[in-house]
Amino acid sequence: MKIIAGGCSFTYNNEMTWAGEVAKEHDLTNMGSCAAGNDYIARSVIHEMDKHESNIILVCQWSGIHRRSYYINHQHTLHRDLVSGDWPDWAGDYTRINEDAVKQQEFWIKTGGNNISKPGSSDRIHNFFVKPYAKYFYSEEQSLVESLENILRVQYYCSSRKIQNIMFWWKKELENYEMSRYSKQLYEQVLKQNTVWLEDLGSWCIENTDLLQKDLDEGNHPTLEQHQSYARQVVLPSISKLM
C-alpha cells in the first residue's frame, strides 16, 4: 500500500516530522512543503495521487487559512528578484519536489507565516505578497471558505477514485475563527465526506508531551520526538485500520 503525505512544514522532511516514522513501516511519498497554504497542499496531493492507479492512502495535514500561493513565471514583475536566491523555502514546485523551484521556468510562491500579520521565513515575500493582500483583500470568512473548498476538492477527488484518506490540522485552526453562513455550509459538507479526521498535531502534542501552547503561538514546531510520538500513537494506528 502506498502512502501519500501532504502538508506544510509540519509534514515536510521525513527526518524531522511524523512522516518519517510512517515511512519506516510503509512506502511513503512526502509532498509536504514549507510555508504551504491549503491551496498549495491540495494541488500537490492531487497531483501525486493522479500518478498512481490504485492501492494508495492519503494522509493530509492542513495548514493556516491565512496562507496563499501565487504562480510565478518569467513574465511576472518580480521574477528577477525572486529567482536571485538558492532553494528558498517559500518557493515550491510540486511537480519536481526534489529540485530547486526558483531554478524552474515556473513555480509557486508560498506566503507561510504563523498568522496574517507575522512574516514567515522571508520579509521580502511578506512585503510583496502578504501585506497588500492583508490590507485590501483579506477576510477571515473568505479564508475559511477557500480553505474548506480546498479540503472538499481533495475529498471529492478521493471519493471519485475510492481513495481512503486521513486528515488533520497542523494545530487548532478552525476553532480560532467564527464561521459565517458561507463557511458553515462548506464545513458541514467537509464533515459529511468519508474522511478519517485525527486530532490536530499541535493539540495532541500539548496534551501528551511537554510541548507548550505558547511555543505553538510563537510559531515554533513540535520536536522530532513529539512528531514521532504522534505518528506512532495516532497516525499509524489509523492507517492500520484502513488496510
PLM regions: where:
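Serine-esterase "nucleophile elbow" of acetyl-processing enzymes
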Residues: 1-52, 223, 228-229
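Alpha-helical cap/lid subdomain in secreted, periplasmic
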Residues: 46-243
